[in-house]
Amino acid sequence: MRTWLWKVVLADGTRTLTTAGRWAEALAHIEEHRGIGQRMLDGRQVAVLAALSHTPTDGAALITMTTPGERWENAVTGCLDVMCRKALRGSAVPLLDRLVEDYVEHQPDQGMTVFDTRLGLTILDLLEPYQEDAAHRMVAELHRRAAVATDGYAARECLADHRFTSLAEPHQVEAARRLVHTCALGRGGLPEPWLARMTEALRGRDEVIRASVGHSRPQQEGLVYRAEV
């Protein structure tokens, strides 16, 4: 439970700060809770992105020292590497070509559709303007994956991306819109029975978190250390 709570504090705090664009504070939050590991997980991603705006050489150094992980981690590392190379005025085209090939050749794991879509859109947006063939391949693959998964969230992510909508065929854009509509996204409410069940689950989780925080305060420092190990 304590390890779980440490992860929640680390992840939710980081997500809140980065969503607000407060990257320096997000990095300080992660460092305070010892959340920067050797693999390209949330903490290390934030550290690289925080460095990009001021000292991209530090971001590049973090990438170089990153321990390879699962395929999706390596893809994220590749995207951040491209961003660092561009910030340092270096060539990123060969790396972008590899990212496109790897994305098209490997299908997403179960439960990773939205993440996979965001990854694909990131690669698409990083492509140079003259990489038109690669960009059209990415758009076609993103459209195909959202359609096969019948995932409205994935379709909505695609529609929110300007480069996707500017390159996609009209029928692809329309298909994505129909999928979002079919999945009832943006309707503004939940049926009352579902809302009641969700409220009950959230209330129970709130009680568990408050009880855990109250019991763990006297030994907080030891908790953080053990959670990191």
Segment roles from a protein language model:
Residues 2-5, 39, 113-115, 190, ...:
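Structural signature of alpha-solenoid helical repeat junctions
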Residues 53-179:
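Long, charge-rich C-terminal accessory regions
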Residues 142-229:
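C-terminal functional modules
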Residues 9, 13-31:
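Alpha-helical protein-protein interaction scaffolds
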Residues 36-39, 47-57:
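Central/C-terminal regulatory/activation regions of fungal transcription factors
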Residues 1-8, 27-35, 40:
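Short, flexible helix-coil linker/hinge segments at the edges of structured domains or between repeats
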